[in-house]
A protein has these predicted regions:
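Iron-sulfur-associated redox domains of electron-transfer enzymes in respiratory
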Residues: 111-231
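Fe-S ferredoxin-like electron-transfer domains
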Residues: 1-96, 102, 106-128
Length: 231
């Protein structure tokens, strides 16, 4: 696997969290192999929606295809072609759940990041930068810094964002309350008027895309309310 893998660990975003890299270090295998194998001709990173793909870093473990098919029940991606030319197909029925990224052991599937663009904006004195955080972030981001799961780091998070250069930090909690109230009113209206039930939340774009792609007959069930971020 390593002999056919690009020697780009120093510039790969997955470096430090790559299972192939960790396994190579554990077994004492060097990237400077005496007998290097052929590299994939698909050595090009490109964006597919919110996903960055680089087929040359794929080790064809098929975790992504198995998870998509067996766990998510979507089956949007699969292995195509044969032999060394085998690649994982693009997910034309993809619902943007992101689980393929989570299970990918290398840098073949990564989430697209706007960090470089944000850094430019933060250093531009003419740009007034605003950040808005979802309620879940305050109790989940701490895990990435070695804290216990569920630790509330609201104060630390706001301080860090201000130090980064954001001029204002807003909380989505207020609009989340608005969403709940609007959805409650809509549910009461549906119950009284004999509308379509059950009423399903419309806050998650991945969920709505799943309905549009796989269950278009259920598009009259989601609430008409916008997500807290949109409100």
């Amino acid at each position: 696997l390593l002999s056919n893998h690009p020697n780009a660990c120093l510039t790969c975003r997955k470096s430090g969290d790559c299972e192939l890299q960790a396994l190579s270090a554990k077994l004492g295998v060097s990237n400077n192999l005496e007998f290097a194998g052929p590299l994939s001709q698909e050595n090009k990173e490109y964006r597919f929606g919110a996903i960055l793909r680089n087929p040359s870093k794929c080790i064809l473990c098929n975790r992504c295809t198995a998870f998509c098919e067996e766990i998510q029940g979507i089956g949007a991606i699969s292995a195509t072609q044969r032999g060394f030319a085998t690649v994982i197909s693009e997910g034309h029925k993809c619902v943007n759940c992101g689980q393929c990224i989570q299970v990918c052991p290398t840098g073949a599937l990564m989430q697209y990041e706007d960090a470089p663009d944000i850094e430019k904006k933060l250093t531009d004195p003419e740009t007034f930068c605003i950040v808005q955080t979802a309620p879940a972030v305050r109790v989940s981001i701490g895990e990435g810094f070695g804290m216990e799961p569920g630790t509330d780091v609201t104060g630390k998070m706001i301080t860090a964002l201000r130090y980064m250069g954001f001029d204002r930090v807003f909380d989505t909690n207020f609009s989340a309350d608005l969403t709940i109230m609007e959805e409650a009113h809509e549910l009461v209206d549906r119950l009284q008027a004999g509308g379509k039930l059950p009423m399903i939340t419309s806050c998650c774009p991945g969920w709505i895309k799943y309905l549009e792609t796989h269950h278009p007959d259920m598009l009259d069930l989601p609430s008409s309310c916008k997500s807290p971020q949109e409100m």
